[in-house]
């Protein structure tokens, strides 16, 4: 084992494991040299035999199935969902990033034609200039002699540099999916129209150093870890250690974990992951929660908040004698002794005991959460070399880098069986696993699948609220995904469409009845919670009643595919400054006049009552103007009303430049419908934006009303969309090797948008020509959203200015911009979400510019498989043997109540 480590660390041998996991070099301290960790690669034709199919011709998730036998490897049936080509994002030395693609070579191709499939041997000196390897062989038998590869490299050097195929994120053009040889002028014109006739500006580094291009996504250490002026904060993270006893630990039984040290236990957990999605979600939630003690404190405070609201409301409602309040002078005079026995009714006692049982279950759940959090803490501390105190400032990119390094460094200790486990670990794959469900939700709202209106004249357009959103996620996602977090196979079968639609309708109706039963308690809790939370804020600063925030539907519209929550949340918070500036530029004279009159009247009453109080301050304050309403009460009411009106009147002079301000705002929200083009200065666009960026007090009232009307939406509106929702999952699902079934838009491959599943083509035949045109328009919108998400995803992980903590902003100075629409305010955080340094340069990414792309079904190309340290024998098997049992699981009353309990403290 020591010899093998020396060979790998020395970087002098290109062994089998180095071909699978990348060459390790001591000069870069075993940095990210594994191609499978940094981009989506392509397999050889031998990998086609690894596809698994069930009896219904539906492919199993590779990470969830048993090792296939030699007989099963010969199965060459076509899968349900075909594999399209992947994206390649190249970066040249001049700072210009290009998009390239590769076609699968023909069997009769020459060696020169297939040179791009060969692996390149490289070192640290020529890493930046050499062509990276495209794929990883699946076994040592595929290893090619070094002499042959030298000849291949020589033939490659004869090709002009500008014509070479260069490696980056994927392999296929995300716009057309075409190879370089099939590119034609019409496709170039489509690409130019998409990027506003200036594609170079979309991908240019705008003067950044050339070494900035070599991020950890592209096989070199992240720039965030390089010191120097103008670069991000330097984090002295130690590379994950190499463990020599991993083979012994992997054979340790689960019952013997108590005898292991925390470090060995963390390594055993890592090597025996049963569900990679759940594990990565726990790692990310631990990062969001800022460590062990912060997460535990947050959970305890959440339980304490619920207890306080219930206790104080029960006590104030049953243990205080309000009839003696005016004539009493001490608390003992109004307090009712033994109020629990004498004042609380038996029905109320039953509900209190149910509440106490709920709290007891939450405390028990907290106990198990503590045990799970300890394992994640050990994983961070011992395997990733990241302490809890660093989580508040360390960027997520560094966590990803440590994850990749952990797998890369300890791969030398894994045996041949373990490295065949098809679990890729890169920034794109990690984001897809963490957001497997969220990506479907983004597409669900972006494609306007749900009908939230009611057949009532005044409630035909019902806005999405947190309560309704929570119920929708519970009904749809809880039904579409199994307990392991994977999409149920029945959703991919056209024959199950009617059955699934009926089951989903029943689920909506059942959820509506549960909301009716719980609505009295939810309304009471919601009113009390928000009263305690916002009363003091509105009392001390009445002007905050006019504050705004984004609506729930706006958040889903603005969020990009594979955009993690902390990145999205920071983007939304930073955009609020510009959003307020945009809204305040539109004066409302009618409202100002009305508020001025109300301010005058309320101020007059306060002045009159105040003057009268001077003559008899002891008695006049308790003088009742109306029954049980004293002077002090009315002075408080009129004073608050005056303060609210005064703060709502905007009498400041502002610079009227709505076009420039909204352009700047769009650079953060990433949302600009084609209907807005050329109308940024109009009142209609401002009102439409205000529906997305509404008053907070309005949203609170909507949430209160939503608790009452949500059951009716679940009964009458959403059941009509059941079959459409089933079609959505079937059409928006693709199979990705090593990941399983994911949302097609999250893979950043335009070929998957057009192809989808076989069921999508069968469904299209049932619609008229006009409906097909509408479908094509929606597909174009989906392609635009996908392309936009791809660009910002690359920028989030490749731009050094974005490698900051969750609550930090880049400290690098802003270079002056000469864009005619640049803002007059020099925000120090503009580079946080900019493509390159020039943050004020607006991206002319209009989502209406992409036209329908030609179908290229013959250009399909598969991504390569990569090895893993994870034991394949411990990966669970997807239990799809009985489709009926899988669909019926959790659909009854108790199953839905169980999901209500599990998700009761999320998004509510």
Curated annotation (Swiss-Prot):
Reactions performed catalytically: a 1,2-diacyl-sn-glycero-3-phosphocholine(in) = a 1,2-diacyl-sn-glycero-3-phosphocholine(out); a 1,2-diacyl-sn-glycero-3-phospho-L-serine(in) = a 1,2-diacyl-sn-glycero-3-phospho-L-serine(out); a 1,2-diacyl-sn-glycero-3-phosphoethanolamine(in) = a 1,2-diacyl-sn-glycero-3-phosphoethanolamine(out); a 1,2-diacyl-sn-glycero-3-phospho-(1D-myo-inositol-3-phosphate)(in) = a 1,2-diacyl-sn-glycero-3-phospho-(1D-myo-inositol-3-phosphate)(out)
The keyword Nucleotidyltransferase is assigned to this record: no
Keyword Acyltransferase applies: no
Pfam families, per the entry: ATG9 (PF04109)
Ranges per topology, Cytoplasmic: 1-299, 371-507, 529-594, 651-696, 718-908
Intramembrane region spans per record: 508-528, 697-717
Compartment(s) of residence: Preautophagosomal structure membrane; Cytoplasmic vesicle membrane; Golgi apparatus membrane; Endoplasmic reticulum membrane
Compositional bias segments (type: Acidic residues): 103-124
Membrane topology listed for this record: Multi-pass membrane protein
Spans within the Lumenal topological domain: 321-349, 616-629
PTM notes: Phosphorylated by ATG1. ATG1 phosphorylation is required for preautophagosome elongation.
Residue ranges, compositional bias (Basic and acidic residues): 146-156
GO CC, alphabetical: autophagosome; cytoplasmic vesicle membrane; endoplasmic reticulum membrane; Golgi membrane; phagophore assembly site membrane
InterPro entries xref list: Autophagy-rel_prot_9
Gene Ontology biological process: autophagy of mitochondrion; lipid transport; piecemeal microautophagy of the nucleus; protein localization to phagophore assembly site; reticulophagy
Biased composition regions of type Polar residues, renumbered to the chain: 126-139, 176-187
Transmembrane segment boundaries: 300-320, 350-370, 595-615, 630-650
Primary localization class, coarse: membrane
Coiled coil, from the record: none
Family listed: Belongs to the ATG9 family.
Chain's role: Phospholipid scramblase involved in autophagy and cytoplasm to vacuole transport (Cvt) vesicle formation. Cycles between the preautophagosomal structure/phagophore assembly site (PAS) and the cytoplasmic vesicle pool and supplies membrane for the growing autophagosome. Lipid scramblase activity plays a key role in preautophagosomal structure/phagophore assembly by distributing the phospholipids that arrive through ATG2 from the cytoplasmic to the luminal leaflet of the bilayer, thereby driving autophagosomal membrane expansion. Required for mitophagy.
Quaternary assembly: Homotrimer; forms a homotrimer with a central pore that forms a path between the two membrane leaflets.
Protein name as it appears in the record: Autophagy-related protein 9
Organism: Kluyveromyces lactis (strain ATCC 8585 / CBS 2359 / DSM 70799 / NBRC 1267 / NRRL Y-1140 / WM37)
Gene (name only): ATG9
């Amino acid at each position: 084992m020591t010899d093998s480590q020396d060979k790998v660390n020395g970087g002098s041998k290109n062994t089998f494991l180095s071909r699978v996991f990348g060459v390790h070099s001591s000069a870069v301290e075993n940095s990210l040299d594994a191609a499978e960790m940094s981009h989506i690669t392509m397999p050889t034709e031998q990998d086609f035999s690894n596809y698994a199919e069930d009896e219904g011709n539906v492919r199993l998730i590779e990470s969830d199935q048993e090792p296939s036998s030699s007989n099963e490897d010969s199965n060459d049936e076509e899968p349900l969902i075909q594999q399209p080509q992947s994206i390649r994002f190249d970066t040249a030395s001049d700072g210009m990033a290009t998009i390239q693609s590769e076609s699968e070579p023909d069997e009769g191709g020459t060696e020169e034609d297939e040179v791009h499939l060969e692996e390149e041997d490289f070192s640290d000196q020529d890493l930046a200039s050499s062509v990276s390897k495209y794929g990883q062989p699946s076994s040592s038998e595929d290893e090619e002699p070094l002499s042959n590869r030298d000849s291949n490299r020589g033939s490659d050097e004869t090709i002009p540099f500008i014509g070479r195929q260069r490696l980056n994120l994927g392999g296929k053009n995300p716009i057309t999916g075409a190879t370089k040889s099939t590119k034609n002028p019409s496709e170039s014109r489509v690409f130019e129209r998409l990027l506003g006739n200036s594609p170079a500006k979309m991908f240019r580094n705008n003067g950044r150093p050339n070494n900035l291009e070599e991020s950890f996504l592209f096989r070199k250490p992240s720039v965030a870890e390089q010191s120097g002026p103008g670069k991000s904060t330097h984090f002295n993270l130690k590379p994950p250690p190499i463990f020599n006893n991993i083979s012994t630990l992997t054979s340790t039984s689960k019952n013997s974990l108590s005898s292991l040290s925390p470090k060995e236990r963390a390594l055993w957990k890592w090597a025996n992951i049963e569900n990679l999605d759940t594990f990565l979600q726990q790692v990310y939630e631990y990062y969001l929660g800022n460590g062990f003690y912060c997460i535990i404190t947050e959970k305890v405070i959440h339980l304490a908040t619920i207890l306080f609201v219930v206790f104080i409301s029960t006590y104030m409602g049953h243990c205080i004698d309000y009839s003696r309040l005016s004539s009493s002078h001490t608390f003992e005079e109004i307090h009712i002794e033994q109020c629990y026995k004498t004042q609380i009714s038996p029905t109320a006692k039953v509900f209190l005991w149910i509440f106490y049982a709920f709290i007891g279950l939450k405390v028990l759940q907290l106990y198990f959460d503590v045990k799970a959090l300890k394992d994640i803490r050990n994983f961070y501390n011992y395997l990733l070399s990241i302490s809890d105190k660093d989580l508040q400032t360390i960027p997520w990119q560094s966590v990803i880098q440590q994850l990749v390094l952990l797998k890369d460094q300890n791969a030398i200790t894994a045996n041949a069986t373990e490295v065949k486990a098809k679990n890729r670990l890169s920034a794109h794959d990690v984001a897809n696993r963490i957001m497997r469900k969220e990506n479907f939700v983004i597409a669900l709202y972006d494609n306007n699948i749900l009908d939230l209106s009611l057949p009532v004249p005044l409630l035909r357009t019902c806005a999405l609220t947190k309560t309704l959103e929570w119920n929708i996620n519970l009904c749809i996602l809880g039904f579409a995904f199994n307990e392991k977090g994977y999409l149920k196979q029945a959703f991919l079968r056209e024959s199950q469409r009617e059955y699934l639609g009926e089951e989903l309708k029943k689920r909506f109706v059942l959820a509506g009845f549960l909301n009716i039963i719980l609505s009295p308690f939810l309304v009471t809790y919601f009113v009390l919670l928000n009263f305690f939370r916002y009363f003091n804020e509105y009392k001390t600063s009445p002007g905050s009643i006019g504050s705004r925030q984004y609506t729930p539907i706006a958040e889903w519209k603005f969020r990009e595919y594979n955009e993690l929550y902390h990145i999205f949340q920071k983007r939304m918070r930073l955009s609020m400054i510009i959003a307020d500036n945009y809204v305040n530029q539109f004066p409302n004279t009618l409202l100002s006049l009305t508020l001025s009159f109300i301010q005058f009247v309320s101020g007059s009453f306060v002045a009159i009552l105040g003057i009268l109080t001077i003559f008899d301050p002891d008695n006049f304050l308790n003088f009742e103007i109306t029954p049980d309403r004293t002077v002090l009460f009315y002075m408080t009411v009129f004073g608050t009303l005056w303060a609210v009106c005064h703060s709502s009147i905007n009498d400041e002079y502002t610079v009227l430049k709505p076009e420039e301000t909204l352009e700047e705002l769009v650079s953060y929200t990433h949302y600009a419908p084609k209907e807005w083009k050329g109308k940024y200065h109009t009142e209609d666009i401002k009102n439409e934006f205000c529906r997305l960026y509404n008053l907070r007090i309005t949203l609170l009232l909507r949430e209160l009303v939503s608790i009452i009307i949500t059951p009716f939406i679940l009964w009458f509106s959403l059941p009509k969309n059941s079959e459409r929702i089933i079609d959505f999952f079937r059409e928006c699902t693709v199979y990705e090797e090593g990941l399983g079934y994911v949302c097609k838009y999250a893979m950043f491959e335009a070929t998957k948008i057009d192809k989808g599943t076989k069921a999508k083509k069968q469904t299209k035949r049932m619609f008229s020509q006009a409906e097909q045109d509408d479908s094509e328009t929606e597909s174009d919108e989906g392609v635009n959203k996908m392309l936009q998400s791809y660009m910002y995803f690359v920028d989030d992980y490749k731009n050094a200015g974005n490698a900051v903590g969750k609550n930090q902003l880049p400290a690098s100075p802003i270079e002056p911009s000469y864009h005619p629409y640049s803002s007059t305010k020099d925000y120090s955080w503009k580079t946080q979400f900019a493509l390159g340094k020039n943050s004020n340069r607006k991206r002319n990414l209009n989502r209406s510019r992409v036209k329908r792309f030609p179908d290229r079904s013959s250009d399909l190309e598969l991504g390569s498989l990569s090895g893993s340290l994870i034991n394949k024998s411990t990966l669970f098997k997807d239990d799809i043997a009985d489709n009926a049992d899988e669909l019926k699981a959790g659909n009854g009353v108790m199953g839905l109540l169980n999901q209500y309990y599990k998700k009761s403290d999320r998004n509510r």
